[in-house]
């Protein structure tokens, strides 16, 4: 992993990640969470956006040089995948959660050929469910998945276990343990809040204050 702490610092700086241990957020899954990560906010800050784009491209160049195609996971993975593809001069496609119900009925948008070596681009990974749905759609079309990259990773065992079972080589620019450690060291949260944040990650589906 590159300088995960610096990436985490940038996310906190633009408030792409919000920590609120005493008034938790509710995720779409229904989980109560003391953290909310919205990397889409980074897109509004050109210098931070450019820095993260560069780090993403460095990781792709160093670890996934064999990639001949980048695939963004809709919707938040699309801008990062497109920017990286532009920088690296690679073709780009994106994957919807499910096929369109009108028009051509595509789930994958863009031009590709079976057998191409594709790298999946996510903005963040939590349980890994949406990531694996995208992988399944790509594999069904005959594409060769060489790995996956993201900006942020919650580090849930369920995701890492499923990626390992599928043989997916995964890299994230930063992660949850790095971010909360930085928040504690800079005084954004106190020791009690840090402990609460650590306990949440152990069992997020049943966590309560």
Question: How would you describe each model-predicted region?
Answer:
Residues 56-68, 135-141:
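Phosphate/pyrophosphate-binding loops at sites that engage ATP/ADP/AMP, CoA/4′-phosphopantetheine
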Residues 81-119, 127-133:
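Short, glycine/charge-rich flexible loops or terminal/linker lids adjacent to PRPP-binding catalytic cores
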């Amino acid at each position: 992993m590159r300088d995960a702490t610096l990436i985490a610092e940038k996310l906190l700086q633009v408030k792409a990640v919000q920590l609120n241990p005493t008034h938790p957020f509710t995720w779409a899954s229904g989980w109560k969470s003391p953290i909310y990560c919205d990397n889409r906010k980074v897109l509004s800050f050109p210098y931070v956006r450019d820095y993260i784009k560069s780090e993403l491209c460095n990781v792709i160049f160093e670890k996934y040089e064999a990639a001949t195609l980048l695939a963004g996971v809709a919707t938040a993975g699309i801008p990062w995948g497109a920017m990286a593809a532009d920088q690296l001069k690679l073709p780009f496609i994106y994957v919807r959660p499910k096929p369109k119900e009108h028009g051509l009925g595509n789930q994958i948008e863009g031009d590709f050929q079976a057998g191409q070596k594709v790298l999946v681009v996510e903005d963040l990974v939590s349980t890994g469910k949406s990531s694996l749905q995208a992988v399944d759609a790509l594999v069904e079309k005959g594409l060769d998945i060489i790995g996956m990259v993201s900006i942020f990773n919650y580090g849930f065992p369920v995701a890492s276990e499923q990626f390992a079972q599928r043989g997916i080589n995964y890299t994230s620019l930063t992660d949850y343990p790095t971010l909360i450690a930085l928040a504690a060291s800079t005084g954004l949260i106190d020791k009690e809040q840090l402990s609460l944040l650590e306990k949440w990650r152990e069992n997020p589906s049943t966590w309560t204050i």
